[in-house]
């Protein structure tokens, strides 16, 4: 299903995940308002978080799913052992927040197809405006808006763009 490059990138991502406090999942909180609106608009009751990181946003006292109005959720992140297995079933909402630039270009279609195969209503994909690639994170697919818009053009996909220069204050949720 995936290319050799995907598995090589996944191995780098797994090492990064093990050695870093990043990818804990707390970045999800910055999308609470947008996702809450989407959940209401599409009457979503359950959700798959594809690329959830360590998933700490779901163990926090301010549970991310509760904040956006989701009753049931499942977690998947191939780079983190505890969430590496893909949950069975389909979900009203599939979210993929700041994940796709870590997937090789040759595997984007396969990953998106996998997410859409688990999606009943809406798949929300968040992409960050990346202006430079000086990072320890294993970015492999840095593309412009037009490329992503064309690549992710599907009736179930809703794109959210975020600017990398906007600071985010987690404290209002913790």
Where on the chain are the PLM-derived regions?
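Conserved N-terminal segment of class I S-adenosyl-L-methionine
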Residues: 1-90, 109, 141-147, 163-173
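S-adenosyl-L-methionine-dependent methyltransferase catalytic module, highlighting the catalytic core
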Residues: 82-84, 91, 95-96, 103-174
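Generic secondary-structure microfeatures
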Residues: 51-54, 98, 103-104
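Hydrophobic transmembrane-helix microenvironments that flank and shape a buried ionizable site
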Residues: 46, 95-98
């Amino acid at each position: 299903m995936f290319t050799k490059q995907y598995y090589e990138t996944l191995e780098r991502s797994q090492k990064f995940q093990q050695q870093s406090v990043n990818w804990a999942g707390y970045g999800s909180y910055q999308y609470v308002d947008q996702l809450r609106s989407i959940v209401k608009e599409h009457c979503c009751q359950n959700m798959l978080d594809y690329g959830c990181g360590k998933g700490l946003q779901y163990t926090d006292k301010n549970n991310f799913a509760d904040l956006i109005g989701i009753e049931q959720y499942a977690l998947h992140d191939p780079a983190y052992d505890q969430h590496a297995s893909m949950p069975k079933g389909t979900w009203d909402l599939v979210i993929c927040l700041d994940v796709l630039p870590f997937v090789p270009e040759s595997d984007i279609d396969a990953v998106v197809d996998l997410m859409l195969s688990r999606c009943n209503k809406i798949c929300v994909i968040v992409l960050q405006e990346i202006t430079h690639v000086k990072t320890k994170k294993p970015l492999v697919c840095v593309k412009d808006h037009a490329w992503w818009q064309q690549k992710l053009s599907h009736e179930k996909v809703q794109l959210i763009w975020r600017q990398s220069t906007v600071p985010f204050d987690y404290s209002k949720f913790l």
